[in-house]
Amino acid sequence: MTADSVVLRRCHSIEDFHACVALQREVWNFTDAELVPLRMFVVADKVGGQVMGAFDGDVMVGFALSVPGTRSGHVYLHSHMLAVRKDHRNGGLGRRLKLMQREDALARGIELIEWTFDPLEIKNAYLNLEKLGAIARRYNINQYGITSSPLQGGLPSDRLIAEWWLKSKRVETLLATGKNPPIVSESSIEVPAQIYDWKAAPETRSKAQQVQERNREQFLRAFSHGLAVIGYERDAESNGKFLLGHWDEKWSYASET
């Protein structure tokens, strides 16, 4: 597989949506009750959402699903799910799918895409903040309840809300130069690289929960003081660090929850 062999396109057919459901099961190993059903993909396509697929030949190897929302009279997109097959990861495919979402949103006059992500997932946080230019200033505790996915490790499904302001200086500078604008970090929140092993093993899961609870408190306190997540660092040992400070741009919709 090469990056050039994977083609991205909109999904509109029932066959495409069946492939999305199957890939979702493969990636997260959800129970049937927790899968986003085929009908939801159909609805998203019909009501102004996005179902973007990535295909290696005839085989779907990734997809992105979003649904439209409104806040204070502004239309935005909530990107609910992005999946990439294991053998196609770490090659930039997730970022390509997000950029396809951005292109489509801007063509329709939409300036904001949001999504949730697990703050314990180091690679995903780095993609969202450093490769896409999202920020975060909201934190939801146990948003989806305890799920059956092994990736969650039986922990509460705490989530940061990524705000991707598509026409912000931060995003446009990153896409034009490959670098985010300089930031002033006022505090940081750390995630140890061992978090994946700790979540996977019942005997060490309490360590992962301690990290989650400590970081939850730090995020909530920082956000209550007007700080935002504006950067992310990884060190040579793959430990992660959220960088928090005051975001100097004024993009916001009122009544954000």
Regions found by a protein language model. Give the residues of each.
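A conserved beta-strand-loop-helix scaffold within acyl/acetyltransferase catalytic domains
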Residues: 6-84, 230-236, 246-249
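C-terminal "cap" of GNAT-fold acetyltransferases
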Residues: 142-175, 245-254
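Conserved GNAT acetyl-CoA-binding A-motif
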Residues: 105-118
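Conserved catalytic-core motifs of GNAT/GCN5-like acyltransferases
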Residues: 116, 126, 133-150, 231-234
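Conserved glycine-rich acetyl-CoA-binding loop
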Residues: 85-96, 108, 121
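A conserved beta-turn-beta hairpin within the catalytic core of GNAT-like acetyltransferases
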Residues: 69-79, 89, 111, 184-188
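A conserved mid-domain beta-alpha-beta active-site/ligand-binding segment of alpha/beta enzyme cores
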Residues: 158-213
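A short, well-structured alpha-helix characteristic of acyl/acetyltransferase catalytic modules
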Residues: 1, 13-26, 171-187, 219, ...
